[in-house]
Amino acid sequence: VSTDRRDPTVNAYGKIYGALENSADYLPVLNPSAHSTDQIPVFPEDPNYDGAAQPAMATSPYWGDEEIWDAATTVHNPMMDSDGRVWITSRARDPGNVPAFCQEGSDHPSAQAFPLGRSGRHLGVYDPSSDTYTPINTCFGTHHLMFAEDADNTLWTSGGGSAVGWLNTREFLQTGDAAAAQGWTPFILDTNGNGRRDDYVEPDADIDPNLDKRINSGLYAVAPAADGSVWGSNLSYPGAIVRVMPGDDPNTTALTEYYELPLDEEGNAIEGFSPRGMDIDRNGIAWVALASGHMGRFDRSQCQGPLNGPTATGQHC
């Protein structure tokens, strides 16, 4: 990453930051102006956690069976804010060492609505002005991350499985309180069609026209839109474009819309399947790269039928 995508004048002529996933616990840095490189060490919040090397999938001609993928942080995706800080999806602790505030019985508003358990990757931030890295312990899992254009510089994330998580970066930078600054919400379809979030049936239950329905729509891509909604992609077959409208209190008001790629009567993809990378433009059009080798666009405004209710479960648009 080299700039804030909301304002690409940020960090002009500055350094470029990368991510190494399981290879090493540092951010590789390129300074194209000085023709130099650097490394920014990253580390878990828990000093007693050093991860575990991943077994080699096959014998390497060079490394043999040596387990070289041994990073503790597994940094996947960097993103830059308006002040040039680099925010990353990075492991802060053992995935199974779940903080109490994440779990059932916590007074955290997100946990009261939908408690969470194990999560494999969290957040972190590097501030070039102070040369300081800070791991951020989140309840929700992370994979990709993207800033909304709001007063809180809300950082939305994918990779949370049954929930989508966010961090109020303004609050976190002011207080350092990761627990208070974060939140998450499950994916709830408005299947009773009344326009608000109500009690819901679980993913393995049939639709009840009097209730809403929770779905396990883990996001791969995540993209906040200009209207305050948050979009993402789902990798399953045939895959889907997912739209979450947070509402006044996302813990309890967020509603999800789920738009699958079209199937024929035999359940075969008509053209293309399984969205991966995705972004949303200023007109609310979703642009996607598909695992089938296609590119695609989705224009919600062209949907003909209702966008909520008992039939709005994927193949309705």
What are these regions (language model features)?
Residues 1-13, 67-83, 144-152, 209-227, ...:
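Structural signature of eukaryotic scaffold interfaces centered on beta-propeller domains
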Residues 78, 114, 118-126, 152, ...:
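Ligand-binding pocket scaffold of soluble enzyme catalytic domains
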Residues 18-28, 88-119, 161-187, 232-243, ...:
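Short, conserved, GDST-rich strand-edge loop motifs in beta-rich repeat architectures
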Residues 34-35, 73, 121-123, 128, ...:
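Marks the mature luminal ectodomains of secretory-pathway proteins
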Residues 11, 28-35, 244-246:
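Polar/charged low-complexity regulatory segments
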Residues 1, 37-71, 114-140, 170-217, ...:
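Surface-exposed loop and turn segments in beta-propeller and other repeat-based domains
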Residues 14, 34-35, 51, 84, ...:
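Detector for glycine-centered tight turns/loop "hinges" at secondary-structure junctions
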Residues 10, 16-22, 81, 86-95, ...:
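Conserved beta-strand positions in repeat-built beta-propeller and related beta-rich domains
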